[in-house]
A protein has these predicted regions:
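Conserved phosphate- and dinucleotide-binding cores of soluble alpha/beta proteins
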Residues: 2, 6, 13-14, 73-240
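Glycine-rich N-terminal segment of FAD-binding domains in flavoprotein oxidoreductases
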Residues: 28-54
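Local beta-strand N-terminus motif with an aromatic residue
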Residues: 61-62, 128
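N-terminal glycine-/serine-/threonine-rich phosphate-binding loop
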Residues: 1-34
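Short, well-ordered alpha-helices that flank and scaffold nucleotide-derived cofactor binding pockets
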Residues: 20, 24, 47-54, 88, ...
Protein backbone atom coordinates (compact mmCIF):
# COMPACT_ATOMS: atom_id res chain seq x y z
CA UNK A 1 0.00 0.00 0.00
CA UNK A 2 1.10 3.61 -0.52
CA UNK A 3 2.08 5.40 2.66
CA UNK A 4 -0.16 7.99 4.24
CA UNK A 5 2.01 11.12 4.33
CA UNK A 6 1.19 13.59 7.07
CA UNK A 7 3.00 16.93 7.10
CA UNK A 8 2.81 19.10 10.23
CA UNK A 9 4.17 22.62 10.75
CA UNK A 10 6.36 22.17 13.80
CA UNK A 11 7.75 19.90 16.49
CA UNK A 12 4.82 20.37 18.87
CA UNK A 13 2.32 19.43 16.16
CA UNK A 14 4.41 16.41 15.26
CA UNK A 15 4.41 15.27 18.86
CA UNK A 16 0.65 15.62 19.17
CA UNK A 17 -0.07 13.88 15.86
CA UNK A 18 2.21 10.98 16.68
CA UNK A 19 0.82 10.66 20.18
CA UNK A 20 -2.71 10.48 18.77
CA UNK A 21 -1.73 7.47 16.64
CA UNK A 22 -0.06 5.69 19.56
CA UNK A 23 -3.03 6.33 21.85
CA UNK A 24 -5.46 5.03 19.23
CA UNK A 25 -3.57 1.73 19.16
CA UNK A 26 -3.29 1.41 22.95
CA UNK A 27 -6.95 2.24 23.53
CA UNK A 28 -7.97 -0.41 20.99
CA UNK A 29 -5.47 -2.99 22.30
CA UNK A 30 -4.42 -2.19 25.90
CA UNK A 31 -1.77 -4.95 25.87
CA UNK A 32 -0.45 -3.94 22.45
CA UNK A 33 2.99 -5.07 21.32
CA UNK A 34 4.93 -1.90 20.47
CA UNK A 35 8.49 -1.23 19.39
CA UNK A 36 9.82 2.29 19.94
CA UNK A 37 12.62 4.02 18.04
CA UNK A 38 15.35 5.56 20.15
CA UNK A 39 17.18 8.76 19.20
CA UNK A 40 15.79 12.20 18.48
CA UNK A 41 13.02 11.39 15.97
CA UNK A 42 10.46 10.15 18.47
CA UNK A 43 11.24 12.51 21.35
CA UNK A 44 8.38 14.99 20.69
CA UNK A 45 5.93 12.08 20.54
CA UNK A 46 7.22 10.51 23.74
CA UNK A 47 7.03 13.84 25.56
CA UNK A 48 3.44 14.32 24.41
CA UNK A 49 2.60 10.79 25.54
CA UNK A 50 4.22 11.36 28.94
CA UNK A 51 2.05 14.45 29.44
CA UNK A 52 -1.06 12.40 28.64
CA UNK A 53 0.02 9.70 31.06
CA UNK A 54 0.54 12.34 33.74
CA UNK A 55 -3.00 13.62 33.09
CA UNK A 56 -4.27 10.02 33.20
CA UNK A 57 -5.63 10.23 29.68
CA UNK A 58 -3.91 6.99 28.62
CA UNK A 59 -2.54 3.94 30.42
CA UNK A 60 0.54 2.05 29.19
CA UNK A 61 0.74 -0.35 32.14
CA UNK A 62 -0.27 -3.37 30.03
CA UNK A 63 1.70 -2.49 26.90
CA UNK A 64 4.32 -5.04 25.86
CA UNK A 65 7.51 -3.42 24.57
CA UNK A 66 9.94 -5.12 22.22
CA UNK A 67 13.32 -3.44 21.90
CA UNK A 68 13.94 -2.31 18.31
CA UNK A 69 17.72 -2.47 18.01
CA UNK A 70 20.97 -2.05 19.91
CA UNK A 71 24.74 -2.01 19.70
CA UNK A 72 26.76 -5.18 20.08
CA UNK A 73 28.95 -5.38 23.18
CA UNK A 74 27.71 -2.24 24.93
CA UNK A 75 26.76 -2.95 28.56
CA UNK A 76 23.38 -1.84 29.84
CA UNK A 77 25.12 0.37 32.41
CA UNK A 78 26.46 2.57 29.58
CA UNK A 79 24.10 5.54 29.25
CA UNK A 80 24.71 5.54 25.50
CA UNK A 81 23.25 2.06 25.10
CA UNK A 82 20.04 2.17 23.11
CA UNK A 83 18.24 0.45 25.96
CA UNK A 84 19.34 3.33 28.17
CA UNK A 85 17.69 5.73 25.71
CA UNK A 86 14.55 3.59 25.65
CA UNK A 87 14.34 3.52 29.43
CA UNK A 88 14.84 7.28 29.84
CA UNK A 89 12.57 8.41 26.98
CA UNK A 90 9.84 5.76 27.04
CA UNK A 91 9.78 3.17 29.83
CA UNK A 92 10.05 5.47 32.84
CA UNK A 93 7.95 8.44 31.65
CA UNK A 94 5.19 6.20 30.24
CA UNK A 95 5.22 4.04 33.41
CA UNK A 96 5.67 0.77 31.55
CA UNK A 97 6.64 -2.13 33.84
CA UNK A 98 10.14 -3.36 32.98
CA UNK A 99 8.85 -6.92 33.24
CA UNK A 100 6.84 -6.27 30.06
CA UNK A 101 9.94 -5.53 27.97
CA UNK A 102 11.53 -8.03 25.62
CA UNK A 103 15.17 -7.18 25.01
CA UNK A 104 17.16 -7.56 21.81
CA UNK A 105 20.34 -8.30 23.70
CA UNK A 106 23.27 -6.88 21.81
CA UNK A 107 25.39 -7.22 24.96
CA UNK A 108 24.88 -11.02 25.01
CA UNK A 109 27.91 -13.29 24.55
CA UNK A 110 26.13 -14.78 21.50
CA UNK A 111 24.15 -11.97 19.81
CA UNK A 112 23.12 -14.24 16.93
CA UNK A 113 21.39 -16.57 19.38
CA UNK A 114 19.88 -13.53 21.09
CA UNK A 115 18.34 -12.49 17.77
CA UNK A 116 16.76 -15.92 17.31
CA UNK A 117 15.42 -15.80 20.86
CA UNK A 118 13.91 -12.37 20.18
CA UNK A 119 12.13 -13.54 17.03
CA UNK A 120 10.68 -16.53 18.85
CA UNK A 121 9.33 -14.23 21.56
CA UNK A 122 7.88 -11.90 18.93
CA UNK A 123 6.17 -14.83 17.22
CA UNK A 124 4.65 -15.90 20.53
CA UNK A 125 3.37 -12.35 21.08
CA UNK A 126 1.75 -12.28 17.65
CA UNK A 127 4.03 -9.67 16.07
CA UNK A 128 4.04 -5.91 16.48
CA UNK A 129 0.75 -4.07 16.83
CA UNK A 130 2.65 -0.82 16.30
CA UNK A 131 6.17 0.00 15.14
CA UNK A 132 7.35 3.56 15.84
CA UNK A 133 10.38 4.21 13.67
CA UNK A 134 12.83 6.96 12.89
CA UNK A 135 14.34 7.51 9.46
CA UNK A 136 18.10 7.45 9.02
CA UNK A 137 19.77 9.91 6.62
CA UNK A 138 20.63 6.91 4.42
CA UNK A 139 17.06 5.62 4.56
CA UNK A 140 17.61 2.99 7.23
CA UNK A 141 14.92 1.98 9.72
CA UNK A 142 16.03 0.48 13.02
CA UNK A 143 19.49 -0.79 11.97
CA UNK A 144 18.28 -2.23 8.67
CA UNK A 145 21.03 -0.65 6.62
CA UNK A 146 21.24 -0.45 2.82
CA UNK A 147 21.24 -2.67 0.87
CA UNK A 148 18.33 -4.09 2.86
CA UNK A 149 16.55 -7.43 2.64
CA UNK A 150 12.77 -7.10 3.08
CA UNK A 151 12.61 -10.75 4.19
CA UNK A 152 15.07 -10.30 7.06
CA UNK A 153 14.43 -11.30 10.66
CA UNK A 154 16.43 -10.04 13.65
CA UNK A 155 20.12 -10.09 12.82
CA UNK A 156 23.62 -8.86 13.59
CA UNK A 157 25.14 -6.37 11.15
CA UNK A 158 27.97 -3.98 10.42
CA UNK A 159 26.97 -0.35 10.95
CA UNK A 160 27.43 1.75 7.81
CA UNK A 161 29.74 4.75 7.76
CA UNK A 162 26.73 7.05 7.29
CA UNK A 163 25.18 5.73 10.48
CA UNK A 164 28.49 5.98 12.32
CA UNK A 165 28.75 9.62 11.30
CA UNK A 166 25.22 10.41 12.51
CA UNK A 167 26.00 8.81 15.90
CA UNK A 168 29.23 10.72 16.58
CA UNK A 169 27.39 13.45 18.50
CA UNK A 170 26.27 10.86 21.05
CA UNK A 171 29.59 9.04 21.36
CA UNK A 172 32.08 11.92 21.19
CA UNK A 173 34.20 10.67 18.29
CA UNK A 174 34.06 8.30 15.33
CA UNK A 175 36.45 5.95 17.08
CA UNK A 176 34.04 5.43 19.97
CA UNK A 177 30.94 4.64 17.88
CA UNK A 178 30.27 0.87 17.89
CA UNK A 179 30.65 -0.80 14.50
CA UNK A 180 28.33 -3.77 15.12
CA UNK A 181 24.64 -3.77 15.96
CA UNK A 182 21.58 -5.98 16.33
CA UNK A 183 18.23 -5.08 14.83
CA UNK A 184 14.76 -6.40 14.30
CA UNK A 185 14.21 -7.40 10.69
CA UNK A 186 12.37 -5.59 7.93
CA UNK A 187 10.02 -8.53 7.48
CA UNK A 188 8.76 -8.03 11.02
CA UNK A 189 8.32 -4.28 10.59
CA UNK A 190 6.46 -4.62 7.30
CA UNK A 191 4.08 -7.09 8.97
CA UNK A 192 3.27 -4.75 11.89
CA UNK A 193 -0.40 -3.94 12.37
CA UNK A 194 0.46 -0.27 12.14
CA UNK A 195 3.68 1.56 11.27
CA UNK A 196 4.52 5.15 12.22
CA UNK A 197 7.69 6.45 10.58
CA UNK A 198 8.92 9.84 11.79
CA UNK A 199 11.20 12.09 9.72
CA UNK A 200 12.37 15.30 11.38
CA UNK A 201 14.74 17.90 10.01
CA UNK A 202 16.18 18.84 6.64
CA UNK A 203 18.86 16.12 6.82
CA UNK A 204 16.09 13.54 6.34
CA UNK A 205 14.50 15.12 3.25
CA UNK A 206 16.27 13.09 0.57
CA UNK A 207 15.72 9.81 2.41
CA UNK A 208 12.03 10.63 2.93
CA UNK A 209 11.48 11.52 -0.71
CA UNK A 210 13.19 8.31 -1.80
CA UNK A 211 11.17 6.25 0.67
CA UNK A 212 7.92 7.71 -0.59
CA UNK A 213 8.90 7.13 -4.21
CA UNK A 214 9.29 3.35 -4.16
CA UNK A 215 8.19 0.19 -2.39
CA UNK A 216 11.19 -1.89 -3.35
CA UNK A 217 14.50 -0.02 -3.18
CA UNK A 218 17.10 -1.97 -1.18
CA UNK A 219 19.23 1.18 -1.00
CA UNK A 220 16.38 2.94 0.82
CA UNK A 221 15.22 0.41 3.43
CA UNK A 222 12.32 2.61 4.56
CA UNK A 223 10.76 2.29 1.11
CA UNK A 224 9.74 -1.29 1.91
CA UNK A 225 7.39 0.05 4.59
CA UNK A 226 5.04 1.05 1.77
CA UNK A 227 4.15 -2.64 1.69
CA UNK A 228 2.70 -2.44 5.20
CA UNK A 229 -1.05 -2.67 5.70
CA UNK A 230 -1.25 0.63 7.60
CA UNK A 231 1.71 3.02 7.46
CA UNK A 232 1.96 6.74 8.20
CA UNK A 233 5.00 8.84 7.35
CA UNK A 234 4.94 11.81 9.74
CA UNK A 235 7.19 14.79 9.06
CA UNK A 236 7.71 18.45 9.87
CA UNK A 237 9.36 19.00 6.48
CA UNK A 238 7.46 21.12 3.94
CA UNK A 239 7.23 18.85 0.91
CA UNK A 240 8.14 20.29 -2.46
Amino acid sequence: MTANLRVVPDEQSLGAAGADIVCDVVRAVPNAVITFATGQSGVPIYRALAERVERREIDFSRVRVFELDGYVGIPLADRRSLYGWLKRDVIVPLRIPEGDITRLRGEASDPVAACREYDRALDRAGGYDLAILGLGPNGHVAFNEPPADPQSDAHVLDVTEESVESAVRYWGSREQVPRRAVTTGLRRLIAAGRVLLVARGEAKRTALERALGSDADPMTPASFLNRSADVTFLTDLPMR
